[in-house]
Amino acid sequence: MAGVLGMILAGGEGSRLKPLTETRTKPAVPFGGSYRLIDFALNNFVNADLMRIYVLTQFKSQSLYIHMKKGWNLSGITDRFIDIIPAQMRDGKRWYEGTADAIYQNLRFVEIVAPDQVCIFGSDHIYKMDIRQMLDFHRRMEAELTVSALRMPISQASQFGVIEVDENGKMVGFEEKPSNPKSIPGEPEWALVSMGNYIFEAETLSKELREDAENNQSSHDFGKDIIPKMFPRGKVYVYDFTTNKIKGEKESTYWRDVGTIESYWSAHMDLLDKDPEFSLYNRSWPLHTYYPPLPPATFVDVKDKKVKITDSLISGGSYIQGSTIYKSVLGFRSNIAAGSFISESVILGDVKIGAGCTIKRAIIDKDVEIAAGTIIGEDLEMDRKRFHVSDEGIVVIAKGSKVGF
């Protein structure tokens, strides 16, 4: 779409997702067997025919860079690009100080493209959005800034920017992560929260960021500084995410922040519902990613041990012998020896699990080897001595671990 530039913030450290983010940036964390978190934001742009995109990186970005190079290379296509921009440190030897500062330090790239509008989106949420519809709303309202929003239970709203709107969709109030969130009028159990997705008029964006950069009292963040300063002027509008319609999708609106171990695990379990809210199978909204050249998943019975797979996703290159897999997601090249039982678990790929293992409610990162007969997830006190265990009882085994040897 002409006149539009996409900028995806992909520099998140993801401290609440450790140990999954010990060796990679948050947007590079695998999801759903075949994808990385960054893929869902990129698909929202590409499926909306928005093909001029900068991806801004910062922490531990090598695996993200490799994934992008293999799966999202548009080189040779005139006026279409998906380019990774690592932290440049052009404005002093410092990391990005906030989301607004990340864009400010890369304004020169915006000026090179000279767009009319700039779409600034995060990269660590699971959802589908036709961004063209949000753009149409932004232009129709003649807004300087449009923020996408959705309803959230009031008990969870303090984790987000909380919004107030008038009957015309204009923002009339905003608080970033308030301790006592305001509810939607007439709906005391619900709040309207920011999704962290913004569409700016390019001239407005440049002006606001330059002013913010000169303010020594600012934290240089869109939610904490830019939006509170802009909305009283009356040109900030709120786009209702529930009005975004995608062919082949359900009416219900699925959006998940997967910033914690519990939410990451739960979002995987959502994929395994009988009729999931978030579908991987909509041909009208294909989910592009890098798919390595692998054979199909293979299932082999071993004597009296039969393969039994129920409510699970098994990715290419996997080899499963005589084991039971229940309500689990297995990434590329998962190798499961005979007699094992895996339940409600997420295996990120390139994992070898020995014979006779029992694994329950676990997340197993890449390149892990587990010895025969190992039991994980039944005795959490014992597991805490060896692994990371979340407050909700999800066992996480770090990348490259050797367990039981």
UniProtKB/Swiss-Prot annotation:
One of its GO terms (biological process) is glycogen biosynthetic process. Belongs to the bacterial/plant glucose-1-phosphate adenylyltransferase family. Involved in the biosynthesis of ADP-glucose, a building block required for the elongation reactions to produce glycogen. Catalyzes the reaction between ATP and alpha-D-glucose 1-phosphate (G1P) to produce pyrophosphate and ADP-Glc. PROSITE patterns: ADP_GLC_PYROPHOSPH_1 (PS00808), ADP_GLC_PYROPHOSPH_2 (PS00809), ADP_GLC_PYROPHOSPH_3 (PS00810). Keywords: ATP-binding, Carbohydrate metabolism, Glycogen biosynthesis, Glycogen metabolism, Nucleotide-binding, Nucleotidyltransferase, Transferase. Alpha-D-glucose 1-phosphate binds at residues 96, 161, 176-177, 194. This is Glucose-1-phosphate adenylyltransferase 1. Pathway: Glycan biosynthesis; glycogen biosynthesis. It is an enzyme of class 2 (transferase). GO terms for molecular function: ATP binding; glucose-1-phosphate adenylyltransferase activity. The gene is glgC1. It catalyses: alpha-D-glucose 1-phosphate + ATP + H(+) = ADP-alpha-D-glucose + diphosphate. Homotetramer. InterPro entries: ADP-Glc_PPase, ADP_Glu_pyroP_CS, GlgC_bac, GlmU/GlgC-like_hexapep, NTP_transferase_dom, Nucleotide-diphossugar_trans, Trimer_LpxA-like_sf. Its EC number is 2.7.7.27.
